[in-house]
Amino acid sequence: MVAVFRELQKTGDHELRFWCDKKFGASARGIFAKFDENIPVDLIIAGKLRRYHGKSILFHLHPSILFPNLRDGFKVMVGFFQSLFKLMKWRPDVIFIKGGYVCLPVGYAARLLRIPLVLHDSDAHPGLTNRLLSPFAKAIGTGAPLEYYNYPPEKASYVGIPVAPEFHPYSEAERKELKEKLGFNVNKLLVVITGGGLGAGRINSAIVAIRENLLSEASVFLISGNQQYEEILKQTDEREGWRLQAFVHNGMAEVLAAADIVVTRAGATTLLELAALHKPTIIIPNGHLTGGHQLKNAKVYQDALAALIVSEDELDKDNRILARKIIGVLKSKKILKGLGDNFGKFAKPNAAKDMAKIILTTVRRQGRRK
């Protein structure tokens, strides 16, 4: 979102605001304080529909899921009226929606007030919010090629996912400098493992189990997430070439750029950041998330020979399959180069600029101010 805002600011003196749910409020305010403290961050009450891929209807009727869903349905109604009053007061020329449950009440309020909607869908499988709002949208940007979506072609454009400018290909010399900066041996290969901001317990446990195998061939940097950091710290001793960190607050692009191979979940933005880096990647998708969107994200790149996939089912049978796959790739310069080159074909360095153009074009077509 910040990348798109940055491009919008280049085109004129626009009044920009960012709306999010309460859970993301503190993080959003911190991000926008660094980017532009004049952009207000407003909080919208919202609720989500808990759906688990591959689970039965009976599973979803369990009180631990049913009651929170009913409660959050009420939150959506509250968020709708909250959004309605805020929009009646502000009357923006266009609303840019990035998906997620907080966008649903905002989108329906905008529809009622006839305020144009522009959507962006990062995942190869459209989320429920975007599927519900897409009939009302004036334009839609997608993170993956259009063949993975059912959006009307006259509305949709494949723009990619806006990523920060520091995600770009690095030279071998630059990567060695980054390894040295991070405290690793510049002459050894480096494996970076990340499960996203909250970490990924299944990936963490697999890496701990195969740590010795990996360290015999490469340096290893595990970004565990805050929840499991202390537990993993107790399970592992200090070793040359081993680094454990809960979270990378600044410089994630440099960490990923330094890596010779990255192991990650299938979050859409993370994958496009790695594509922008032309980074050889092994994806371990979370198969239980809503709609199976991580499985579908991963398949896009697997089909293009741009990444390798290891399923959680495979890990459950034998963690060593991950070690064999990582080491096998590291030992083949041809495979490393092939994966990086193929992944790089998905990079869209102008995604933020293209998305900003779509937003401004929508405003002009609706006869609103330029």
PLM feature spans:
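Acidic donor-binding loop of glycosyltransferase active sites
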Residues: 93-94, 257-272, 279-280
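C-terminal alpha-helical cap of glycosyltransferases
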Residues: 348-370
